[in-house]
Structures are given as structure tokens and as C-alpha cells.
Swiss-Prot record:
Role according to the record: Involved in transcription antitermination. Required for transcription of ribosomal RNA (rRNA) genes. Binds specifically to the boxA antiterminator sequence of the ribosomal RNA (rrn) operons.
HAMAP family recorded: NusB
Protein family per UniProt: Belongs to the NusB family.
Organism: Nitrosococcus oceani (strain ATCC 19707 / BCRC 17464 / JCM 30415 / NCIMB 11848 / C-107)
Stated name of the protein: Transcription antitermination protein NusB
A GO cellular component annotation in the UniProt record: cytosol
GO MF annotation list: RNA binding
Keywords: RNA-binding, Transcription, Transcription antitermination, Transcription regulation
Gene Ontology terms describing biological process: DNA-templated transcription termination; transcription antitermination
Pfam families: NusB
Length: 148
């Protein structure tokens, strides 16, 4: 995860973690990141995630809910933030291929989540992708079948 957008996801994860655990205002979180002068990130994308996830939290949690094995408030806070970022991208950024969304989320979970958190994140977001990106999911499966 070395590109600007990947770094924006990492920063958004950190900001959303603060928002989830401490209820800190996203404007203040954004200012903290500006003051830190984090270089090499897509700041506009960071802001989109940092603001978009809280704004659409209800919709995101509703989308994730059927695939979770427990209530969302009982999911590890880091993994919860990663799942919400992934669900946001799957729902709101259709130009980003679902495989990219899943791979980025898995990498975040490997770096910041619990020992096997990446498996949990992958399993949940894969099911969300099948639901909300059904056409993209089916066309990828069809291409694979045609190649064999």
C-alpha cells in the first residue's frame, strides 16, 4: 500500500478510529491531519472517507449487518472502521473495482487489525460486494470461466 490513495485510506482509518472511540468531531480530526502535514496522501480522498463514512454510517451498518456474526458495536473498532471504509467504497465509488476495495481493506486489516482480522474483513466485504456489485461480480466470474 504505497500509493496516495492507499495512504489516504490509512489516514482515514486512523481518523475514523478516533471518531468511533472518542466521538471526536471529524472537522477537528481533519485539522489535526492538516497540522501534521502528512505528505504523499490524496487529501481530497481522505476527506471524502473521513466525512462520508460518518454521514452514511446508518446505511453502511445496514449494508454490513446481514453478514456480521455479531452486532456492529461488538466488532473490533479497527476492523469496524475498515469494514465501514470498504462498504463506503463499494457503495459510493463504483469506479473503484471491488477487488481493489477488498485488497486495500485486507491490507489495512493485516497492518492494523487483530491477528486474523484480515480474514474476517475479507469474508464480510466479499459478501457485501456480491450484493452491491452483483453485475461486476458476475462479469468477473464469467471472464474467469471463459479463460479456462
Amino acid at each position: 500500500m504505497s500509493n496516495r490513495r492507499s495512504k489516504a485510506r490509512t489516514a482515514a482509518l486512523q481518523g475514523l478510529y478516533q471518531w468511533q472511540l472518542m466521538g471526536q468531531d471529524v472537522d477537528k480530526i481533519d485539522i489535526e491531519f492538516i497540522v501534521q502535514d502528512i505528505r504523499g496522501i490524496d487529501h481530497a480522498y481522505f476527506q471524502e472517507l473521513l466525512r462520508g463514512v460518518p454521514q452514511r454510517q446508518g446505511e453502511l451498518d445496514e449494508c454490513l449487518g446481514p453478514f456480521l456474526d455479531r452486532p456492529i458495536n461488538e466488532v473490533d473498532p479497527v476492523e469496524c472502521a475498515i469494514l465501514r471504509i470498504g462498504a463506503f467504497e463499494l457503495l459510493c465509488r463504483p469506479e473503484i473495482p471491488y477487488r481493489v476495495v477488498l485488497n486495500e481493506a485486507i491490507e489495512l486489516a493485516k497492518r492494523f487489525g487483530a491477528e486474523h482480522g484480515h480474514r474476517y474483513v475479507n469474508g464480510i466485504l466479499d459478501k457485501v460486494a456480491q450484493k452491491v456489485r452483483a453485475t461486476e461480480f458476475r462479469s468477473r466470474a464469467l471472464r474467469r470461466r471463459l479463460q479456462t
